[in-house]
Amino acid sequence: MILTVTMNPSIDISYPLDELKIDTVNRVVDVTKTAGGKGLNVTRVLSEFGDSVLATGLVGGKLGEFLVEHIDNQVKKDFFSIQGETRNCIAILHGDNQTEVLEKGPEVLEQEGQDFLEHFKKLLESVEVVAISGSLPAGLPVDYCASLVELANQAGKPVVLDCSGAALQAVLESPHKPTVIKPNNEELSQLLGREVSEDLDELKEVLQEPLFAGIEWIIVSLGANGTFTKHGDTFYKVDIPRIQAVNPVGSGDSTVAGISSGLLHKESDAELLIKANVLGMLNAQEKMTGHVNMANYQALYDQLIVKEV
């Protein structure tokens, strides 16, 4: 079983409009509300793929109850309740444009943060792999993800970590390393304080920097150009076919689902990387974020080749 962790989930509300009119009333007919957050995208894809998954994180108030109720019934859920209210994230789709209004979310009390660590520690007993995704809510220290990684390491569970900014920096600077990180070029540039290109020789040098020491897998997303990966002392490039992308949002989360699944099933390097890339592409072909059509899985899988470089 895979444990997905979403520390700052949301109710994602979609308002489709032909035109967004400013300073007047806009009436929406077709409103969509879903359980949102990067970790919950991972959860949905794992469930659709057929893997057993347990979802956890922080929820609060009536919106928190709504969120838990709107997670697929096939998914096991064990969220931790806090005093603050779970946030809304609103996307206004007007024409070819998308305007987002994102609430800050709840401020987590120090004791709630400590209590969740105990909750997380107990959940580790029943899972084989952990996937931690997304931002931290206000109130939690910047090194909170490092604390989660430390507990997972102590329990002997591999961790796929998909966060960015100060939270990722804190993990990289701590002695407690995740099994996998999945930065993109922009995030690598932010971490190193210099521009990082997609040149393979440069990426090889970058991923051998002391900052990344101790991390078994570093899978760099190159968007439409596939992925570049360092696993131990071996480097891989995966090229992907051109596809008709409908909605690329959530493709990174779908890739995390594939990585986590590969670790769960102890797949070879090539199998894990192909699965991760295929699930990312399948998400991009769908309108709904964090959703894959498994009927198209094998056709894409057969087109991908992993090259050692």
Curated annotation (Swiss-Prot):
Cite the annotated pathway: Carbohydrate metabolism; D-tagatose 6-phosphate degradation; D-glyceraldehyde 3-phosphate and glycerone phosphate from D-tagatose 6-phosphate: step 1/2
Cellular component terms per the entry's GO annotation: cytosol
- Provide the taxonomic classification: Bacteria, Bacillati, Bacillota, Bacilli, Lactobacillales
Q: Which GO terms describe its biological process?
A: D-tagatose 6-phosphate catabolic process; lactose catabolic process via tagatose-6-phosphate
The molecular function terms of the Gene Ontology recorded here are: ATP binding; phosphofructokinase activity; tagatose-6-phosphate kinase activity
Q: What gene is behind this protein? A: lacC
Q: Which keywords appear in this protein's UniProt record, sorted alphabetically? A: ATP-binding, Kinase, Lactose metabolism, Nucleotide-binding, Transferase
Q: List the catalysed reactions.
A: D-tagatofuranose 6-phosphate + ATP = D-tagatofuranose 1,6-bisphosphate + ADP + H(+)
Species whose genome carries this gene: Streptococcus pneumoniae (strain P1031)
Q: Which PROSITE patterns match?
A: PFKB_KINASES_1, PFKB_KINASES_2
UniProt superkingdom: Bacteria
Q: What is this protein called?
A: Tagatose-6-phosphate kinase
Q: What is its EC number?
A: 2.7.1.144
